[in-house]
A protein has these predicted regions:
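Extended, charged low-complexity segments
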Residues: 163-229
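Extended hydrophobic secondary-structure segments that form protein cores and membrane-embedded regions
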Residues: 78-81, 147-153, 202-207
Length: 229
C-alpha cells in the first residue's frame, strides 16, 4: 500500500542497502517467509533501528519450526543475509563476509530478537512457543540452533535477444543448474574454512541479466511507479 511506500521512501533511496529498500533484503524476506516457511522476527529496517549500538550486519531474523521433521519441538533461528553481485563467486564471498560478522555478534542478535518478540503480532500459540524458546523457564528449554538464510543474485550471462522465449527458458534452466553445480563445492569449502559446519544453511539463488544495474532499477520502479522518464 501507499503507507508502506511512504515509509520506504523515508527510509532511503531505491536499492540503498540497509534501509529495507534493497532488492536482496526484500527477496530474502520473501524466500524465508514464503518458501522456507519461517516467520520473520525482525526485518532489516527493524534491525537497523534496534541494533544501532552494535551495527547489525544481519538482513533479517526468522524462526523456522522443525517440529514435524524431528517429532519434538525444535527450531532454527535463521539469520539472513543477501548479496546481489554480477559475479557469482563474488556474491558468495560477500554473503560469507557478512555471515562472519553476524557470527561475531550472534549473542547481541539473539538478545535483540528476544526483546522484540513481545511486540510482534504472531498468533498466541506462536508467541508462546517463541517465548518458551528464547526465555526458557526453569527446567524447560526448547532446543534451537542458529542457521543462515542466504539470498544470492548474479549475472546469468545469456542474452535473451539470441533465443526464442521457449529456448531462453531452457537455456536459463541449464545455465543456472551449471552455475549452481560449479559453485556448490566452493560454498561448501567456505563453510568448512570458516568453521561454520555446525550451522544449517538455506540458499536461494536468482539469476538476473545485469545484477548490478537491475537491483536499483527494479526498486526504482517499485518505489516510483514505473521509474523516471
Amino acid at each position: 500500500g501507499m503507507d508502506a511506500l511512504d515509509i520506504m521512501k523515508r527510509n532511503g533511496n531505491p536499492g540503498q542497502k540497509g534501509t529495507g529498500n534493497d532488492l536482496g533484503e526484500i527477496l530474502l524476506y520473501v524466500f524465508l517467509e514464503q518458501v522456507l516457511g519461517a516467520p520473520k522476527i525482525m526485518s532489516k529496517v527493524e534491525l537497523q533501528t534496534g541494533a544501532k549500538q552494535y551495527g547489525s550486519k544481519c538482513d533479517g531474523i526468522h524462526l523456522l519450526s522443525l517440529e514435524q521433521e524431528f517429532g519434538m519441538p525444535y527450531y532454527h533461528m535463521v539469520f539472513g543475509t543477501s548479496s546481489i553481485v554480477g559475479d557469482m563467486k563474488k556474491a558468495v564471498d560477500t554473503a560469507f563476509d557478512a555471515i562472519v560478522e553476524i557470527e561475531k555478534q550472534s549473542t547481541q542478535e539473539r538478545t535483540l530478537a528476544e526483546n522484540t518478540v513481545f511486540s510482534k503480532s504472531f498468533d498466541k500459540d506462536t508467541v508462546q512457543k517463541i517465548k518458551d524458546l528464547l526465555i526458557p523457564s526453569k527446567g524447560q528449554s526448547i532446543p534451537y540452533d542458529t542457521a543462515y538464510g542466504v539470498f544470492l543474485a548474479y549475472n546469468l550471462g545469456l542474452n535473451p535477444a539470441n533465443y526464442s522465449a521457449v529456448d531462453f527458458r531452457r537455456a536459463l534452466t541449464q545455465k543456472m543448474d551449471t552455475d549452481i553445480r560449479n559453485h556448490a563445492a566452493y560454498i561448501a569449502s567456505k563453510i568448512n574454512a570458516l568453521g561454520l559446519g555446525n550451522h544449517s544453511f538455506y540458499f536461494y539463488i536468482l539469476p538476473l541479466n545485469d545484477a548490478d544495474a537491475e537491483k536499483t532499477q527494479i526498486m526504482d520502479r517499485v518505489m516510483n511507479g514505473g521509474g523516471r522518464p
